[in-house]
């Protein structure tokens, strides 16, 4: 089959990409949403979401499934479809995936982030055998008194610690500083439950035989290394941008590899927009949703040149 023509190709089906697809189609743009893995991005592996308006508390997977259901009423959504190549030919983008080739007028990149690794001995060896980056996926194996450590000090680490505690795991949080940077509400919940925190501490090595059975932890203040018996290690120390597509298109990025955008989500390349965690800053669902809608509306303005865009230009030139 020949190339598929679209107005807009959106890459990444997290909250930003799904919102962009809804807004794009509602604005009248022929849109396709491509996702190389499963729907939902980081939210899909978040045990509980408590700060998304309209839901006091909702499992992340449930929230993204609801978003996906709504998105599929408007836009084509292709899962397990990965962008392999993308190039600009005159005023169109040729997007090659493992399944098809698309020719599009505009591109929205909502490719998100992936988990940062500890980069310590034993981490890779025991991945899936005690080392995890997803409490929602793997927490069940450590219920009923199993000893686990959660490494990190942000919202994700605190959420993991609380979730594992509710499963009945014996949880210790390991943080390299003497202050957590997570929300106050999460700190209070951890204190209330008596979750132990090892301050000013880092994991030096993950030990085990067939599975994890211990970790070496260094106290940075005391300069002491001690071995602690554990069954599991959950890593939550931040994220790295999924910027492969941005690199292919030669987009301007910041020092950490996040895509630079203006307030309308436009990138350094005309007709290419970015939204969600890939733009850096505050990694929150509400922000991703907001940026997704703005990216789609900017794409609509640039592709369709509606009368109000011309009026705006006139006002600005006066």
What residue spans do the PLM features occupy?
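Nucleotide donor/acceptor-binding cores
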Residues: 6, 29, 105-106, 129, ...
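FAD-site-proximal beta/loop scaffold in flavoenzymes
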Residues: 1-3, 119, 125-142, 237-287, ...
């Amino acid at each position: 089959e020949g190339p598929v023509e679209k107005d807009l190709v959106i890459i990444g089906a997290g909250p930003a990409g799904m919102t962009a697809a809804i807004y794009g189609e509602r604005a009248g743009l022929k849109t396709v949403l491509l996702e190389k893995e499963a729907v939902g991005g980081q939210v899909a592996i978040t045990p509980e979401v408590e700060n998304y308006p309209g839901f006091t508390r909702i499992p992340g997977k449930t929230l993204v499934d609801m978003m996906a259901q709504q998105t599929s009423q408007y836009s084509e959504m292709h899962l397990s479809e990965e962008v392999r190549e993308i190039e600009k030919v005159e005023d169109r983008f040729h997007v090659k995936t493992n399944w098809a080739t698309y020719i599009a007028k505009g591109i929205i990149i909502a490719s998100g982030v992936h988990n940062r690794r500890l980069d310590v001995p034993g981490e890779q060896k025991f991945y899936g055998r005690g080392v995890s980056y997803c409490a929602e996926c793997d927490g069940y194996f450590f219920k009923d008194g199993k000893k686990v450590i959660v490494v990190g000090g942000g919202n994700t680490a605190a959420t993991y610690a609380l979730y594992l505690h509710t499963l009945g795991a014996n949880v210790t949080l390991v943080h390299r500083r003497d202050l957590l940077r997570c929300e106050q509400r999460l700190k209070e919940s951890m204190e209330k439950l008596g979750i132990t925190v090892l301050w000013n501490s880092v994991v030096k090595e993950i030990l085990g035989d067939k599975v994890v059975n211990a970790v070496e932890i260094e106290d940075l203040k005391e300069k002491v290394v001690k071995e602690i018996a554990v069954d599991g290690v959950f890593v939550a120390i931040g994220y790295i941008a999924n910027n492969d597509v941005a690199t292919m298109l030669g987009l301007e990025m910041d020092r950490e590899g996040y895509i630079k955008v203006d307030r309308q989500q436009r990138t350094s390349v005309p007709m290419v927009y970015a939204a969600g965690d890939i733009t850096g800053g505050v990694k929150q669902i509400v922000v991703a949703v907001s940026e997704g809608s703005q990216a789609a509306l900017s794409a609509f303005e640039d592709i369709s040149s509606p009368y109000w865009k011309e009026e705006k230009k006139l006002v600005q030139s006066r």
